[in-house]
Amino acid sequence: MSILLFGVSHRSAPVSVLEQLSIDESEQVKIVDRVLQSPLVTEAMVLSTCNRVEVYAVVEAFHGGLSAIGQVLSDHSGMSMGELTKHAYVRYSEAAVEHLFAVASGLDSAVVGEQQVLGQVRRSYSAAEANRTVGRVLHELAQRTLSVGKRVHSETSIDAAGASVVSVALGIAERKLGGLGAKTAVVIGAGSMGALSSAHLTRAGIGKVHVLNRSLARAQRLAGKIRQSGVLAEARTLDRLAEVLTDADAVVSCTGAVAPVVSLADVHHALATARRDETTRPLVICDLGMPRDVDPAVAGLPGVWLIDVERVQREPSAHAASADVAAARHIVAAEVAGYLAGQRMAEVTPTVTALRQRAADVVEAELLRLDNRLPGLDSAERDEVARTVRRVVDKLLHAPTVRIKQLASAPGGDSYAEALRELFQLDQTAVDAVATAGELPVFSSGLDAGSGPQGADGPSAGPTPSAPNPSAE
């Protein structure tokens, strides 16, 4: 078994494709359950954000697992496999681990170094764990990933500027409006992104905030927090959107809705009612939703500036300092090496355990033979003989078993477990029983980024009629 990643992100696809693939929280369980219907997939979890849709899975065979995941995403998005392949990237084994570590560290984000993605990884893992779709392999990977993300943010200055998609978008809005002080803003969505937007607006000196949400209670809670910061805030339901837009200078929307919540008619009506245009009072709309919350046609209205995720990516403040990025990548590389060393060591552990069990069985058999040959041996003498024999066996096995774990943990050490089984004629069934009993996880590794496995399942991750083409991101 090994880890397979199938993904599409802002680096490989335009927003229109990400919109089609977007998976909201209510759909994630269904997507994972469909992926797990394949007998070749044993564990799976989905990471779906404004910038990416990625499926991480533990698979028995590369091409079969890849085909199963690709087909589920193709059916979900309505895209043909060929269309999906154009924008997809695939990572396998070591490369999948490295990619997830980099994602959690903010290295693959639209705004490099942002911390929100670490929370998104945590929520994706928690959801998969609650649904029992992650086992030992993805559990350990997710736990290590969260640790790596925290380490990068604590040991580097990659997030020193506190940049995020929200902060960069509002920074653009602030420039367009000549500052946000005493301005009126509309925040659509009262979730985590809405709260983050409100915090940035408050720090920027915004004069008033309208919070809109489907649930009025959630909008009221967020509005209450804003008022505690000394800023005027009102809560509204979404059907009041056209009304509040007439007085808005800036709008931030990130709802996760499957269709636009801000229509061309809404914005046109607001501008016409207030007799606003580009010169009298411009309107800046930050659409941070995925799928998009704002009808793209809004950008064609005079006096409206539409800022989306693609625009945010082009902003200089979305890119961290090269030295900080290099430091973060160094940590990720070291963590990947450490993780894989631990997994390789874990792979040989069941064999070592089986060897020690074989030795214990031999000792017990010989002690029984001794009892039959020397029935007059008293219990004290027998106990001393038993302790002596066990000490001899333990001392003989200690150094080689410790050393073989060290050798197996190094790159290219995959063959040591097999050599040990061959030398001591250990039954593979016994070794498998130890591994299945939960001693330590077994992990198969050994692929470079963007390449497929060598062996029975196929020579490479090249394109096939039923599987997407693994490509460099």
From Swiss-Prot:
Residues reported in the UniProt entry to bind NADP(+): G189, A190, G191, S192, M193, G194
Site features described as Important for activity, chain residue numbers: H99
Known pathway: Porphyrin-containing compound metabolism; protoporphyrin-IX biosynthesis; 5-aminolevulinate from L-glutamyl-tRNA(Glu): step 1/2
Assigned keywords, A-Z: NADP, Oxidoreductase, Porphyrin biosynthesis
UniProt binding sites for substrate: T49, C50, N51, R52, S109, E114, Q115, Q116, Q120
EC number assigned by the record: 1.2.1.70
Active site: C50 (nucleophile)
The UniProt record lists the keyword Transmembrane: no
Region (Disordered): 445-473
Keyword Oxidoreductase belongs to the record: yes
GO biological process: protoporphyrinogen IX biosynthetic process from glutamate
Catalytic activity reported: (S)-4-amino-5-oxopentanoate + tRNA(Glu) + NADP(+) = L-glutamyl-tRNA(Glu) + NADPH + H(+)
InterPro entries: 4pyrrol_synth_GluRdtase, 4pyrrol_synth_GluRdtase_dimer, 4pyrrol_synth_GluRdtase_N, GluRdtase_CS, GluRdtase_dimer_dom_sf, GluRdtase_N_sf, NAD(P)-bd_dom_sf, Shikm_DH/Glu-tRNA_Rdtase
An annotated Gene Ontology molecular function: glutamyl-tRNA reductase activity
Quaternary organization: Homodimer.
Protein function: Catalyzes the NADPH-dependent reduction of glutamyl-tRNA(Glu) to glutamate 1-semialdehyde (GSA).
Family annotation (HAMAP family): Glu_tRNA_reductase
Family: Belongs to the glutamyl-tRNA reductase family.
Miscellaneous comment text of the record: During catalysis, the active site Cys acts as a nucleophile attacking the alpha-carbonyl group of tRNA-bound glutamate with the formation of a thioester intermediate between enzyme and glutamate, and the concomitant release of tRNA(Glu). The thioester intermediate is finally reduced by direct hydride transfer from NADPH, to form the product GSA.
Name of protein: Glutamyl-tRNA reductase
Organism this protein belongs to: Mycobacterium ulcerans (strain Agy99)
